[in-house]
């Protein structure tokens, strides 16, 4: 196991009927900005309920944060905050709203252009650059990204998606109420299942380093998502199923399962380029890329793939290579069973998409991806070709 530091200060408030706790979690004298996405949070009455729970605090609202949030939207929110004197932000929605809010709270206390903060986001925005971002909390309505309990964001600018990290943008608290997910469109639920699943495989399907606890955590999340995947789509108001989905999504990317073990992330980074170029949903791009990547990188990941086959899919017969092949096939079948196609051609994309994405990877400096830095543009081309 590798050396690691694990730090996560986010207070999780889990379960139904918890909005009244906002009155104790948000400072009494705060001037609050509620950030949210489309109109569903307003139409459902959730925003009104949150405003009521905030009591006598001054509350402003900033809506319209889009899926795959753009730098331009974040810039408008920062200008709004500086104009109105906001000092606490409450993100209401899914990962896109929370990701945008992380950049917004940094930009709100930075003297220069917000784009400078975004471009300083890897490996991490320097503390001296933004030493005091505004505090923020979240009320989650979509289980998927894990952004409610981590310090990362992904922002869209031009034809690229930019990761942004800072040790100072963990949410102060996150409210996870499974009942707030009951009215989600089916497509978003499917995407959330796949996102949670692939967040986990990115930190698990690499190579062994005797991270036994981390492996068991990951296997538990994967097995749970396989067990509940179809049911959480088909029975949206099953509280216990949605509760497990929501908690699994948070645990998949709060730093715990990746502590002390190698991490891949090539599937996500290639997927980000597909989203930026063709506006495919993030979950769809992961379903396309992961099985193809596992096929191409099978030899390098063989030991963990065989372990995955045995422990997660209960495949016990055959050589390690045979087990790996069966596990990869099972993974593809799982995504397809949710009604999510796993080939580029299913979305009207062919060889020209392969060329475009490889060029974007090169243009954005994504030339040494994967846990060993050996997913070069040539390997990415092989993966995308396999995904056709």
Please report, for each region that a protein language model flagged, where it lies by residue.
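C-terminal charged capping/lid subdomain of soluble metabolic enzymes
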Residues: 305, 316-388
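Glycine/serine-rich anion-binding loops at beta->alpha junctions
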Residues: 86-102, 141-147, 277-280
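A glycine/threonine-rich phosphate-anchoring loop and its flanking beta-alpha core
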Residues: 10, 110-210, 307
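Short Gly/Thr/Asp-enriched flexible loops that form oxyanion-binding sites at enzyme active sites
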Residues: 77-78, 97-111, 149-150
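ATP/NTP phosphate-donor binding region
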Residues: 1-88, 344-345
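Short glycine/serine/threonine-rich phosphate/pyrophosphate-binding segments
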Residues: 19-22, 42-46, 71-72, 96-101, ...
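Active-site segments that bind and position negatively charged phosphate/pyrophosphate groups
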Residues: 203, 207-330
């Amino acid at each position: 196991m590798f050396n690691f530091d694990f730090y996560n200060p986010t207070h999780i408030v889990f379960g139904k009927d918890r909005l009244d706790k906002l009155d104790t979690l948000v400072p009494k004298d705060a001037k609050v900005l509620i950030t949210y996405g489309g109109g569903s949070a307003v139409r459902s009455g959730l925003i009104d309920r949150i405003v009521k729970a905030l009591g006598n605090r001054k509350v402003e609202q900033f809506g319209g944060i889009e899926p795959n949030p753009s730098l331009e939207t974040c810039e408008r929110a920062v200008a709004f905050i500086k104009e109105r004197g906001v000092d606490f932000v409450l993100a209401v929605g899914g990962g896109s709203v929370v990701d945008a809010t992380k950049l917004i709270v940094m930009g709100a206390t930075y003297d220069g252009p917000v784009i400078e903060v975004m471009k300083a986001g890897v490996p991490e925005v320097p503390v001296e650059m933004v030493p005091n971002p505004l505090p923020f909390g979240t009320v989650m309505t979509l289980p998927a990204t894990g952004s409610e309990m981590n310090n990362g964001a992904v922002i869209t600018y031009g034809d690229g998606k930019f990761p942004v990290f800072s040790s100072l943008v963990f949410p102060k608290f996150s409210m996870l109420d499974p009942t707030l997910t009951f009215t989600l469109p089916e497509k978003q639920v499917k995407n959330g299942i796949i996102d949670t699943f692939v967040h986990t495989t990115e930190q698990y399907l690499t190579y062994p380093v005797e991270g036994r606890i981390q492996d068991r955590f990951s296997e538990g999340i994967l097995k749970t998502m396989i067990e509940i995947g179809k049911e959480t789509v088909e029975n949206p108001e099953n509280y216990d199923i949605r509760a497990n989905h929501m908690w699994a999504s948070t645990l998949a990317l709060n730093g715990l399962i990746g502590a002390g073990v190698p991490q891949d992330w090539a599937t996500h980074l290639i997927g980000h380029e597909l989203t930026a170029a063709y506006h495919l949903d993030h979950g769809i791009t992961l379903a396309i890329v992961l099985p193809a990547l596992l096929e191409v990188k099978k030899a390098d990941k063989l030991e963990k793939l065989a372990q995955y086959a045995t422990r997660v899919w209960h495949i016990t017969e055959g050589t390690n290579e045979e087990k790996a092949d069966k596990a990869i096939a099972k993974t593809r079948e799982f995504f397809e069973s949710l009604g999510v196609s796993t080939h580029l051609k299913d979305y009207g994309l062919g060889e020209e998409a392969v060329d475009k994405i490889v060029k974007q990877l090169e243009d954005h400096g994504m030339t040494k991806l994967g846990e060993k830095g050996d997913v070069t543009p040539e390997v990415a081309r092989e993966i995308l070709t396999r995904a056709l």
